[in-house]
């Protein structure tokens, strides 16, 4: 039976000094011997998804203490991708995932904590904490800050649902007046919480439900709704129970690596494909699997993407549908329930709150439960009042959306599309694969041939798009923006948003070794692997080359002969794999350290150290 890790610092004559320091934090004689639970918070006033978390760590801490544990809170960093976007700040976003994972590992191992509650929300914070949980393999429960309410605005007599992406697209559209842009900007992000569509933050918080590491509703319950408080309260009690089950009863089924095994990762990826999650989730799922030693890779994602249909379309794929609508339709447990009916989910994986995922679905799927509590929970609605305060409203929908034929969440028999929401493409331009969010691609361009317009950076691409260098039928190629080449693998939301604003959203394609915001839609293909900086063929594309994209057949190819590609490769090897012209980019020592060990996107952009 494993001993509590914390005994290392709380027991024995030689630990008198450590106990003295513990006492200085408020611990008493009666606390030594209780499980010490790390409350891993990520409060910051920089990020709307985290601005309301300040007091929530202490809410969880009090519940831990009431359940018989000792709670010790600390904070991680949190980068807002939307604020960091469009300038060199975006170079820091993906590397911050590793800093977060490292900081959690450092704090938990340095102080010998027994278990942890991870309070996350936005783009790299949930993945960073997930990586840490898989590394540490101690009992862990995830509880996020929740999604923000969708913006609502009346424009020219019509009520429109808004989010962050609408503000960006409107700002670049010359046909929209300055006054309308201001109205959209002021209404797009009305409350605290993670941005309201199926963007990266919400996608990842939904996936923790499928992995079995968070409570039902974690991904969809609004940050402002009073129902969300229950998740924090329950997390505090639950983690003490999990710690006792492991350390006192030798129950390894409560450990992250047991819960999030390969079958659980397949469940999570199936959910991701069905709900049309952000392409960034592929990076983060691959990274978490790597950290936990789980044999799950691009070939598994490719296999699943060929059989899992798209059951839900949420902004940016469907602009009038947001996370509050997903919640009303039953949230993630409903999507998992529909997948389970189709034989596309493994019911036998463990969760932190039920014996198995199948048990959780039976209890929490609104189309099969008899629980009025569950039905009321999923009626939680937006309050419609701008606020930065958590749990500040208790509005409810009059009814639930259970329409499996035409509602927000569809059945396997009547999906939005038989093809899932994400796909892996292979070809001579991406031998190790690349990713496209098919849920956001118009059916008319699922097959696309176009001429390459090549840019050596996102900045150059933005300038070119706004300068009308790109026309209908083109394929924009943005390279040297991968994990090493950027460094940091910037998101390309501005180029895709500007293509939309120029009326080219359904007339062009974009391929990059960088990545995309969860807010991106259109024929946007990212994560081209190997990246240009590692000798990937995306670095061999030349202006005017024909590129052929075939999503139904999962291929992407540069229509150049093998002999010509070999000649270009030999020439590039002599020059070195770097942009043709120097870029005005401040690459600091911290970023260089990340780039030195970063792998390509097909490996999750994790750091791989030489043997």
From Swiss-Prot:
It comes from the Bacteria. The active site is at 517 (proton acceptor). Pathway: Amino-acid biosynthesis; L-isoleucine biosynthesis; L-isoleucine from 2-oxobutanoate: step 3/4; Amino-acid biosynthesis; L-valine biosynthesis; L-valine from pyruvate: step 3/4. SUPFAM superfamilies: IlvD/EDD N-terminal domain-like (SSF143975), LeuD/IlvD-like (SSF52016). The modification N6-carboxylysine is found at residue 124. It catalyses: (2R)-2,3-dihydroxy-3-methylbutanoate = 3-methyl-2-oxobutanoate + H2O; (2R,3R)-2,3-dihydroxy-3-methylpentanoate = (S)-3-methyl-2-oxopentanoate + H2O. InterPro entries: Dihydro-acid_dehy_C, DihydroxyA_deHydtase, DiOHA_6PGluconate_deHydtase_CS, ILV_EDD_C, ILV_EDD_N, IlvD/EDD_N. PANTHER family: D-XYLONATE DEHYDRATASE, D-XYLONATE DEHYDRATASE YAGF-RELATED. Mg(2+) binds at residues 81, 123-124, 491. The keyword Thylakoid does not apply. It comes from Agrobacterium fabrum (strain C58 / ATCC 33970). Belongs to the IlvD/Edd family. GO terms for molecular function: 2 iron, 2 sulfur cluster binding; dihydroxy-acid dehydratase activity; magnesium ion binding. It is an enzyme of class 4 (lyase). GO terms for cellular component: cytosol. Its cofactor is [2Fe-2S] cluster; Mg(2+). This is Dihydroxy-acid dehydratase. Signal peptide: none annotated. Functions in the biosynthesis of branched-chain amino acids. Catalyzes the dehydration of (2R,3R)-2,3-dihydroxy-3-methylpentanoate (2,3-dihydroxy-3-methylvalerate) into 2-oxo-3-methylpentanoate (2-oxo-3-methylvalerate) and of (2R)-2,3-dihydroxy-3-methylbutanoate (2,3-dihydroxyisovalerate) into 2-oxo-3-methylbutanoate (2-oxoisovalerate), the penultimate precursor to L-isoleucine and L-valine, respectively. Its EC number is 4.2.1.9. [2Fe-2S] cluster binds at residues 122, 195. Disulfide bonds: none annotated. Homodimer. GO terms for biological process: isoleucine biosynthetic process; L-valine biosynthetic process. Keywords: 2Fe-2S, Amino-acid biosynthesis, Branched-chain amino acid biosynthesis, Iron, Iron-sulfur, Lyase, Magnesium, Metal-binding.
């Amino acid at each position: 039976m494993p001993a509590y890790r914390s005994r290392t610092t709380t027991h024995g004559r030689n630990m008198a000094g450590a106990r003295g320091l513990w006492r200085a934090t408020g611990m008493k004689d009666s606390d030594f011997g209780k499980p010490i639970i790390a409350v891993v918070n990520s409060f910051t006033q920089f990020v709307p998804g985290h601005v309301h978390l300040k007091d929530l760590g202490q809410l969880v801490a009090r519940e831990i203490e009431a359940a018989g544990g000792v709670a010790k809170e600390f904070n991680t960093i949190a980068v807002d991708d939307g604020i960091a976007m469009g300038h060199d700040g975006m170079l820091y976003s993906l590397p911050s995932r590793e800093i977060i994972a490292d900081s959690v590992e450092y704090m938990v191992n340095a102080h010998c904590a027994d278990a942890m509650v991870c309070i996350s929300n936005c783009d790299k914070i949930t993945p960073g904490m997930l990586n840490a949980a898989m590394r540490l393999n101690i009992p862990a429960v995830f509880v996020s800050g929740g999604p923000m309410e969708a913006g609502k605005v009346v424009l020219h007599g019509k009520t429109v649902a808004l989010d962050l992406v609408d503000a960006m697209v409107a700002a670049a559209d010359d046909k929209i007046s300055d006054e309308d842009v201001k109205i959209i900007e002021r209404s797009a992000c009305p409350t605290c919480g993670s941005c309201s569509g199926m963007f990266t933050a919400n996608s990842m918080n939904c996936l923790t439900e499928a992995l079995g590491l968070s409570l039902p509703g974690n991904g969809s319950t609004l940050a402002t709704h009073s129902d969300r408080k229950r998740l924090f309260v329950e997390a505090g009690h639950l983690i003490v129970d999990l710690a006792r089950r492991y350390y006192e009863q030798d129950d390894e089924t409560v450990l992250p690596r047991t819960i999030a095994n390969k079958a659980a990762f397949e469940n999570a990826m199936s959910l991701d494909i069905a709900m049309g999650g952000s392409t960034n989730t592929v990076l983060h799922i691959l990274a978490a699997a790597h950290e936990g030693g789980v044999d799950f890779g691009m070939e598994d994602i490719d296999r699943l993407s060929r059989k899992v249909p798209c059951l839900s379309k949420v902004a940016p794929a469907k602009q009038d549908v947001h996370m509050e609508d997903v919640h009303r339709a039953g949230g993630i447990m409903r999507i998992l329930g529909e997948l389970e009916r189709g034989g596309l989910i493994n019911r036998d994986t463990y969760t932190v709150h039920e014996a198995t995922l199948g048990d959780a679905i039976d209890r929490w799927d609104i189309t099969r439960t008899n629980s009025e509590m569950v039905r009321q929970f999923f009626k939680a609605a937006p309050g419609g009042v701008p606020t930065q305060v958590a749990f500040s409203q208790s509005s409810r929908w009059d009814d639930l959306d259970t329409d499996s034929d035409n509602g927000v969440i569809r059945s396997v028999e009547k999906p939005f599309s038989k093809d899932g929401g994400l796909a892996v493409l292979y070809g001579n331009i991406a031998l190790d694969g690349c990713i496209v969010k098919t849920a956001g691609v118009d059916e008319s361009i699922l097959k696309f041939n176009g001429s390459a317009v090549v840019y050596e950076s996102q900045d150059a691409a933005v300038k070119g798009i706004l300068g009308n260098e790109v026309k209908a039928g083109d394929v924009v190629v943005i390279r040297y923006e991968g994990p090493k080449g950027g460094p940091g693998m910037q998101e390309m939301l501005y180029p895709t948003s500007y293509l939309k604003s120029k009326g080219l959203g359904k007339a062009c394609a974009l391929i990059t070794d960088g990545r995309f915001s969860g807010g991106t839609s259109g024929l946007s293909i990212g994560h081209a692997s190997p990246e240009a900086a590692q000798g990937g063929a995306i670095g061999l594309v030349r202006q005017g080359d024909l590129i052929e994209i075939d999503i139904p057949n999962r291929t992407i190819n540069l229509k150049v002969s093998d002999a010509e590609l070999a000649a270009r490769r030999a020439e590039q090897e002599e020059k070195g794999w770097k942009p043709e012209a120097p870029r005005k980019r401040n690459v600091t020592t911290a970023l260089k350290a990340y780039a030195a060990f970063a792998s390509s996107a097909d490996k999750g952009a994790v750091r791989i150290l030489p043997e």
